[in-house]
């Protein structure tokens, strides 16, 4: 655990590489017909799981820490061992359909305790409906998963869209190698749709063809090869923007690119909705000014911003309503319940709804112990909260930041946040 003393964030910081684009670029590069080169790739623990996965399927990597070159196999090979996805839902949901592309045999995909509680039913059902074979080893729709190889012809499939868009992205990538391509029809409301735009962008750059309308159509055009510099991650950089705001500081975040699709660009709109001053100057975002008013938000398409919105709402006396995130209950933790419990510890009025929170904030009290519940995004949000209290707070679970942003605490301290270790 760590102790965060009252602090004010000041200075500049480079945005970490996008975790979402790193996953997509690596998965697509495995299926390319020619070598790929990826620059500025994330070194987060979740992305390392994806790097290890493409190696297990036969990709050969050359890594000089600035760029990774990927030599793909002719087709994904049968892994020699179980694919350990760690805590990465993206990894297991992308590589379950990719596992159908091996010449034969079976692939077993599993992960840590958190991952083994995350639902996989939609991707299991989709693979089976398309003529493949996939099961949950415990027959409960949760990992471990067992997937048979041999290839899929493709065709049409319906998928429940209410849990995660990762199922759709995984099928979009894998289906570039299906014999007939694929048409996917979402059932119900499709959450996190902007992430599909990110998947489409990577596939487009590699030479594949995707249509995103009410239905998703993927042509059977294998990716040719990918050269891609991973942009900065708006969603992760937004935690420094949050800290700047609630501590009354000023932070400049560099190396962001709003010209490529980014689901978590929504963080900029969320900050502004609370009255925070945000300037965008080229590749820089400048944030200063405390939150001034409550906000009513629907974060259906950007659930990872939910903890940030909750902390902003905690520092304004007006009521805020943050909804549309029922699917945030099945992330690395139940983010709705866990954010509610932690905000109550610092005296914030919270009403929990099935799909979000109603929050009346003010001046959260410090001097308490907060728990990140092993969730990296909750931890980063709580650090901002703790720094903005008069007494500071102790926070458990700092190791979780390695999942997405290994240098988060180091970067926070460079901005002036007083973090104490060895408690």
From Swiss-Prot:
EC numbers for this chain: 2.5.1.19
A Pfam cross-reference name: EPSP_synthase
Gene3D superfamilies xrefs: Enolpyruvate transferase domain
Positions with a binding annotation for phosphoenolpyruvate: 19, 89, 118, 166, 335, 377
TM segment ranges: none
Active site, renumbered: 304
Catalysis: reaction(s): 3-phosphoshikimate + phosphoenolpyruvate = 5-O-(1-carboxyvinyl)-3-phosphoshikimate + phosphate
Subcellular location: Cytoplasm
Domain of life: Archaea
GO CC field: cytoplasm
GO molecular function, one term: 3-phosphoshikimate 1-carboxyvinyltransferase activity
Residues at which 3-phosphoshikimate binds: 19-20, 24, 164-166, 192, 304, 331
Biological process according to GO: amino acid biosynthetic process; aromatic amino acid family biosynthetic process; chorismate biosynthetic process
InterPro entries: Enolpyruvate_Tfrase_dom, Enolpyruvate_Tfrase_sf, EPSP_synthase, EPSP_synthase_CS, RNA3'P_cycl/enolpyr_Trfase_a/b
Alphabetical UniProt keywords: Amino-acid biosynthesis, Aromatic amino acid biosynthesis, Cytoplasm, Transferase
Record's function text: Catalyzes the transfer of the enolpyruvyl moiety of phosphoenolpyruvate (PEP) to the 5-hydroxyl of shikimate-3-phosphate (S3P) to produce enolpyruvyl shikimate-3-phosphate and inorganic phosphate.
Assembly: Monomer.
Family: Belongs to the EPSP synthase family.
Identification of the protein by name: 3-phosphoshikimate 1-carboxyvinyltransferase
Organism, as annotated: Korarchaeum cryptofilum (strain OPF8)
Gene name for this UniProt entry: aroA
């Amino acid at each position: 655990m760590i102790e965060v003393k009252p602090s004010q964030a000041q200075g500049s910081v480079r945005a970490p590489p996008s975790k979402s684009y790193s996953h997509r670029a690596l998965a697509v590069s495995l299926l390319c017909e020619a070598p790929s080169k990826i620059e500025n790739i994330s070194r987060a623990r979740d992305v390392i799981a994806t790097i290890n996965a493409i190696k297990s399927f036969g990709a050969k990597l050359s890594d000089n820490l600035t760029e990774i070159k990927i030599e793909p196999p002719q087709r994904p090979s049968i892994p020699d061992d179980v694919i350990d996805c760690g805590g990465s839902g993206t990894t297991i949901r992308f590589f379950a359909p990719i596992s159908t592309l091996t010449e034969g045999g079976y692939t077993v995909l599993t992960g840590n305790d958190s991952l083994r509680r995350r639902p996989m039913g939609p991707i299991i059902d989709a693979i089976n409906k398309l003529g493949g074979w996939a099961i949950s080893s415990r027959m409960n729709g949760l990992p471990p998963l067992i997937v048979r190889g041999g290839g899929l012809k493709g065709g049409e499939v319906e998928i429940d869209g209410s849990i995660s868009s990762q199922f759709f992205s995984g099928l979009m990538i894998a289906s570039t190698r299906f014999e007939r391509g694929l048409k996917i029809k979402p059932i119900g409301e499709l959450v996190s749709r902007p992430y599909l735009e990110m998947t489409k962008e990577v596939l487009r750059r590699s030479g594949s063809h995707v249509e995103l309308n009410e239905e998703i159509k993927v042509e059977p055009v294998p990716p040719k090869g990918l050269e891609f510099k991973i942009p900065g991650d708006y969603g992760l950089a937004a935690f420094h923007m949050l800290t700047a705001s609630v501590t009354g500081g000023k932070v400049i975040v560099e190396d962001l690119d709003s010209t490529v699709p980014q689901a978590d660009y929504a963080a900029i709109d969320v900050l502004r909705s609370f009255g925070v001053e945000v300037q965008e100057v080229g590749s820089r975002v400048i944030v200063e000014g405390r939150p001034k008013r409550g906000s009513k938000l629907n974060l259906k398409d950007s659930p990872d911003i939910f903890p940030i919105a909750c902390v902003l709402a905690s520092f304004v006396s007006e009521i805020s309503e943050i909804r549309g995130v029922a699917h945030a209950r099945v992330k690395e933790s139940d983010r709705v319940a866990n954010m509610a419990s932690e905000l109550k510890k610092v005296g914030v009025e919270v009403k929990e709804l099935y799909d979000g929170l109603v929050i009346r904030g003010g001046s959260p009290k410090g001097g308490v112990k907060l728990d990140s519940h092993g969730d990296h995004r909750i931890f980063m949000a709580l650090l901002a909260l703790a720094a903005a209290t008069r007494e500071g707070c102790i926070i458990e679970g700092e190791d979780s930041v390695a999942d997405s942003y290994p240098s988060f605490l180091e970067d926070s301290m460079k901005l002036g946040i007083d973090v104490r270790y060895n408690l």
